[in-house]
């Protein structure tokens, strides 16, 4: 049994700190706290009305994916990871992550509610897991890992991929919009959320490094490649980034770069199959 998964009554108290690196990352997460009220959307609507039909389509579908994905991450945290892990330092992080994912979900829902005036279209976006095949495909992959009977090590790799790969291309696309000087509320919230998700992905890698018996490099690489292929399809075929003037080929390369970095963090070599 992995030490961090070994049941102990010490999980009910925080001190004395045993895993100082995990505790440090928890405190880093707390220091990054923010709320949706800090994001000013008042100037976004003027920019929204200036966007092309394709640009609006792209942003709406990206927001629809994000609005549903944070709830999936939270379900995994509440049902699996918080139950799996027995050290109080990690439970503190997971508990705070749940709170932050709720704020992310609220932010994305508020963005959709602000930009989309038609109520029928709005509900279509809020129910993207059911109404959009491209969003459903990503959601199904993540939910498959929530219900999986695989060991914690494999599941933590999968959710590192969700937060490190499934989100990365969409974050980059919104940063592209920022470079054009548009949508200050959207782009500021993107900065805050991408910072949080980067920390969540780093924490998954940290938890992985605490495993004495991690999954094989072959298993890790297979999980990452699977996520990369789904993300490439999402941003180059289903909702292609060329709708907002980005290069699909370069986006694919960026996703590969992110995946290679994640593989390195997980102790693997860069994959030639990505």
UniProtKB/Swiss-Prot annotation:
Question: What's this chain's function?
Answer: Ribonucleoside-diphosphate reductase holoenzyme provides the precursors necessary for viral DNA synthesis. Allows virus growth in non-dividing cells. Catalyzes the biosynthesis of deoxyribonucleotides from the corresponding ribonucleotides.
The protein's Enzyme Commission number: 1.17.4.1
Task: Name its co-factor(s).
Answer: Fe cation
Question: One GO biological process from the UniProt record?
Answer: deoxyribonucleotide biosynthetic process
Q: Which reaction does it catalyse?
A: a 2'-deoxyribonucleoside 5'-diphosphate + [thioredoxin]-disulfide + H2O = a ribonucleoside 5'-diphosphate + [thioredoxin]-dithiol
Q: Does the keyword Glycoprotein apply?
A: no
Kindly provide the name given to this protein in its UniProt entry: Ribonucleoside-diphosphate reductase small chain
Q: Report the source organism.
A: Swinepox virus (strain Kasza) (SWPV)
Where does the record place the catalytic residues? 108
Keyword list, A-Z: Deoxyribonucleotide synthesis, Iron, Metal-binding, Oxidoreductase
- GO MF annotation, one: ribonucleoside-diphosphate reductase activity, thioredoxin disulfide as acceptor
């Amino acid at each position: 049994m992995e030490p961090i998964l070994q049941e102990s009554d010490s999980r009910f108290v925080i001190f004395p700190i045993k895993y100082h690196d995990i505790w440090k990352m928890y405190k880093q997460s707390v220091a990054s706290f923010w709320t949706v009220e800090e994001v000013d959307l008042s100037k976004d609507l003027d920019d929204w009305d200036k966007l092309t039909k394709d640009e609006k389509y792209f942003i709406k579908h990206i927001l629809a994916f994000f609005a549903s994905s944070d709830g999936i991450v939270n379900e995994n945290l509440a049902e699996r990871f918080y139950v799996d892990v027995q050290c109080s330092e990690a439970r503190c992080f997971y508990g705070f992550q749940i709170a932050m994912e709720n704020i992310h979900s609220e932010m994305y829902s508020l963005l959709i509610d602000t930009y989309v005036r038609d109520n029928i279209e709005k509900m279509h976006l809020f129910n993207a897991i059911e109404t959009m095949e491209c969003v459903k495909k990503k959601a199904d992959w993540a939910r498959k890992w929530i219900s999986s009977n695989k060991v914690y090590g494999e599941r933590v790799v999968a959710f590192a991929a969700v937060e490190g790969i499934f989100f990365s291309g969409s974050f980059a696309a919104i940063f592209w919009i920022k470079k054009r000087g548009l949508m200050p509320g959207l782009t500021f919230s993107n900065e805050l959320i991408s910072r949080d998700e980067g920390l969540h992905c780093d924490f998954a890698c940290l938890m992985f490094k605490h495993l004495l018996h991690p999954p094989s490099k072959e298993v890790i690489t297979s999980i990452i490649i699977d996520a990369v292929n789904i993300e490439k399809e999402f941003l180059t075929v289903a909702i292609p980034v060329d709708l907002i003037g980005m290069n699909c080929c370069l986006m694919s390369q960026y996703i590969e770069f992110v995946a290679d970095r994640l593989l390195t963090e997980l102790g693997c070599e860069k994959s030639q199959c990505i």
